[in-house]
Amino acid sequence: MKKLLALLLAAVMFALPALAMADDLTMGSWRTEDADAVSALLAKYEELTGVKIVYQPTTSTQYNATLRQQLDGGIGPDLFYSRTYSTGAELYDNGFNVNCADIPGVKENFTATALEGFTAADGGIFAVPFAAVSHFVYYNKAVFAENGIEVPATFEAFLAVCEQLKAKGITPLANGIAANWDILECVLCGMIPNYITAEERLAYESGEKKLNDETWVRIFTDFAKLVPYLPEAFASIDNDQANVMFGLGQSAMLIDGSWSYGTLSGDDYDIDVGFFPMPAPAGKAAGFSLHPDFGIAGNAASAHPEEVKAFLAWLATVDGAKEAAKVIPEGFLPLINADVAPEGSVISAMNAVGEGKNADRRFVWNMMALYTPFVDQLNAICRGEQTPEGAANAINALWEAELAK
């Protein structure tokens, strides 16, 4: 494998005079906020190989549509961030992605679990796994200490903490519903592994288990118990505003993704941030949300096919993953099967809190037809317009109709 990688890199080096006169390679992404970090990684790669790759991110809400238009028009980036599961597989199924199954290191350095989110129905691998994310309850350590609060071990204890804070005039949670994604991805999907194992999730996906059964009514019921502890103006608060609210000390906690840790613990805010997974109800096995977030894909129509494959091969090495781990924002968890966390990184601590728990990815990712309906039902529960039973029945009816197509 190392010999093949060396040959690929050597081929790139040999072609440098031509590359110097040709257009630079480009990389598409939905993470505009990572421009400096990813550019540093690409600069390191250029230092090693002489190949320049220009980072060209698109606003996250426009990325999927923009990328598809570019690929359809034959002007897509040479490399691009790939979504996982069905959304990412759709591009591969339409012939846009390099099949990474034969890229050196991909099958050797990533576990079957890591590759699952990037594997198409025909067994092809449509991207090199890059980073996973998790979902946590962030808490202000000073507020907890001042009020004699310890990290809760059960969901019931978590609700008691929220009630204690609210009684003292402290807003327990900064979360809102205006963004129409984080209430599902961060809040509900952070809760679900406490109720449903990965194996049980598959039974829901197939229709063997129903989305309005006792378990799902319980999940929606417990979600509804969080609503009294949201800010008064929760309907108009989006994810960015929730982060600012928590960062400025205007709430004691925030349920959000691991990717927000770097910002919340950074220089913009003067708070000491702790985190814990949403605890399971008493008597239930603790779960942990660990979701493969994105990989790096190669454009099958790139004018620089060998350079694309060489970069993907580099990312699939331990050395490449170590370089990536140095610059990607705190809270993104490398998917390679090796310890590549930089010294002092929060990655090890985030992985540690998930040890021994029932880990699974975001529930809805193989049921994307339910994404918006889930958000709508959660928003309706928050506004007092829907009951947990009604939400479960609505979601189940939609999925049964989808399976019947």
Feature locations, PLM:
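Extracytoplasmic/periplasmic substrate-binding proteins
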Residues: 28, 87, 221-304
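Conserved C-terminal helix/tail region of periplasmic/extracytoplasmic solute-binding proteins
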Residues: 43, 52, 145, 321-322, ...
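Extracytoplasmic "Venus flytrap"/periplasmic binding protein-like
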Residues: 44-113, 117, 142-153, 252-253, ...
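A structural signal for short loop-to-beta-strand junctions that line the ligand-binding cleft
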Residues: 70, 77-78, 107-142, 171-179, ...
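Hinge/lid segment of periplasmic solute-binding proteins
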Residues: 83-136, 150, 159, 165, ...
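Extracytoplasmic/periplasmic solute-binding protein
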Residues: 126-128, 135, 159-208, 251
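Glycine-centered hinge/linker elements that transmit conformational signals in sensory
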Residues: 164, 205-235
